[in-house]
């Protein structure tokens, strides 16, 4: 695994995202992700949680899989990542609303190594064809975005979230929650 000193991380932050400095504990979180450590992040809205998986995805080999509950949020994240790159294939999402041609294009971009971030709803991630596809892909890490929804909306919300753990051995949770006690309910 590559080592990234603080100076290099700051250089890459500027190069990829145009920021001169990290917010709060972003750098420590990013370093943990780069070192392959499971990481649970508590940050307020606007705290920069997304960058905590976006920058490592850009720096690591393979594609980062981001599990998100809302298609609109996935689309916003993909659109934002594409503004930072000249390659529209840098980020994609896969969901049930896509036609076969669009799914094939996304999968092709992933297999060619163009895609660094691939977003799924939990229902899409747990579909057998997507599980089979991901077995062919070098995955850099997994992130669960907006995991607080599991706690706030109850464990009956999106039962597919319970099926993620058997599919993924190590899950990186990047979440927005207001109280640490929810960690126990989410896990």
Language-model segment annotations:
Residues 130-174:
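SF2 helicase catalytic motif II
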Residues 175-187:
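Single conserved hydrophobic/aromatic residue that forms the stacking wall/gate
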Residues 41, 66, 118-120, 142:
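Hydrophobic positions in the central parallel beta-sheet of the AAA+
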Residues 34-35, 47-63, 80-82:
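Walker A/P-loop NTP-binding motif
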Residues 65, 71-119:
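Conserved nucleic-acid-binding Ia/Ib motif block in the N-terminal RecA-like helicase ATPase lobe
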Residues 35-41, 62-63, 115-116, 174:
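Pre-Walker A (Motif I) flank of P-loop NTPase domains
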